[in-house]
Amino acid sequence: MAADKSVDNTKKIIGIDDITDTKTIWRCLAAELIGTLLLVLIGTGSCTGVQISEGDVVVRIALTFGFIIATMVQCIGHVSGCHINPAVTCGLLVTGHISILKAIFYIIVQCVGAIAGSAILKVITPAEFRGTLCMTSLAPGVTPPMGFLVEACITFVLILLVQSVCDDRRKNLGNAAPVAVGLAITCCHLAAIKYTGSSMNPARSFGPAVNGDDNWANHWVYWAGPIVGGVVAGITYRALFRARKPEEEASSYDF
């Protein structure tokens, strides 16, 4: 019996059943692809051909990203969880809310969606207004280690909120999740745009990097920072804030 339970738990962690349930997995992957595509298309569309130094532009960009993500959470949250961000997927992976194989597929389609969204923006935007397609880059004077810490910190805030929203002990959320996530995104953008462009999302940075020109300088910052921040936030929430009840029917996996 113990051996059978161990095998079943291992299968859940790896996600064999998730992948073999083809109808469900394809719906989830389609939702993640379309969600990330729209995030990048609408979000980065708000900052093509503008100077980030303009104060009103910073507010516009922050609100656009916050609103589009809140919209996507409402649209596809019930389908795939609306990760649309590899850092979110990694943060939920370490807390057992998603299996390994499913997480890998999510990250792949998120990157594909981001590339497609940025490509569409490039096609529909006149050349004189494209700029860098809202590619994230470090501001003058911001070193890669500084950028890494900024991205890790703001992503920590986002994933801590996501973990709270996903906590199955909470019964008081109602329909607040989209608003909460949107506000967190807006807040972090307002704080960090002038440092790193406020990515918090490797796919969001990857799409414009693929479609733009001369755009890979310090790109690692936008993968390492958010993923580290997301993983640390996931571990922190699970260790400090998520109650462990012996009688509860856990919806997560024990690693």
Swiss-Prot record:
Record-linked Pfam families: MIP
CDD domains, sorted: MIP (cd00333)
SUPFAM superfamilies: Aquaporin-like
A GO cellular component entry from the record: plasma membrane
Domain of life: Eukaryota
Disulfide-bonded cysteines: none
Motif NPA 2: positions: 201-203
Signal peptide: none
Cytoplasmic side: 1-29, 82-103, 163-172, 237-255
Keywords: Membrane, Repeat, Transmembrane, Transmembrane helix, Transport
Keyword Transferase: no
GO MF annotations, alphabetized: channel activity
TM region positions: 30-50, 61-81, 104-124, 142-162, 173-193, 216-236
KW Cell wall biogenesis/degradation (keyword) present: no
NCBIfam families, per the entry: MIP
Summary of subunit composition and partner proteins: Homotetramer.
Domain remark from Swiss-Prot or TrEMBL: Aquaporins contain two tandem repeats each containing three membrane-spanning domains and a pore-forming loop with the signature motif Asn-Pro-Ala (NPA).
Protein function: Forms a water-specific channel. May be involved in the transfer of excess sap dietary water from the initial midgut to the terminal midgut and the proximal part of the malpighian tubules.
Protein's name in the database: Aquaporin AQPcic
